[in-house]
Amino acid sequence: QIVSDFRISIGIGILKNMFHITAVDLYGNTLYTNTIPFPYSNTPDYYKQVTDKIKEFIATNQYDEEKILGVSIATQGITSPDHSTVLYGNIMNNTGMILEDFSRYLPYPCYLEHDSKSAAFLELWKHPELDSAVVFLLNRNLGGAIITNHQIHQGSSMHSGTIEHICINPDGPLCY
C-alpha cells in the first residue's frame, strides 16, 4: 500500500480577487486548503507575494521540501500548448501571465493550466473509468472542458471546451 502523504502536490487556483492554495496527497485527497483574498495584478510584487504565501502554507503545514512533487497553477485564461503563458485572459486581464513569474520564486516544478481543464484533470483522476464527459466549472464565470477517449480535448488552439464564450443571445450584453 502507498503511504498517501509520502509526497504531496500543491494546487493554486487564481481568481480575480483571491487565490486558493490546496495540498493533496498521492490519492488526490485534500489535506489542507486556504483561501487568501488578494486581487490579481500582473506585477512582480503580486507574483512574489503569492509565492511567499505558498511557501508559508507549506511551512505552516510542516511539509518538508523534498515531499513536494510540484505546484500546479490554475487560472482563468487560455494557456499556450507548452503551458508557459496565458494567451487569452480577458476575465482577469491576465493575458501574458507567464509561468516563470511564479516558478522563479519556487524550488519545485510548476505547471500552468486553464482552470476548467484543471477541473477536468481532477475528474479523470477521481473517476478513472470516465471515458467521455463535458465538465462544467461553475463559479462567477462559467467554464468548461471536454473529455473524449479518457483525454482532455485541447482543440487546435487550446480553446476546446471554452463554453463560456458561446453566444446565446446575439443582442445580449457582451461577456466583458
Language-model features: where?
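Glycine/GP-enriched mid-protein hinge/lid loop-to-helix segment characteristic of carbohydrate kinases
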Residues: 33, 108-176
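Gly/Thr-rich phosphate-binding beta-strand-loop-beta motif of the actin/hexokinase/Hsp70
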Residues: 2-33, 134-148
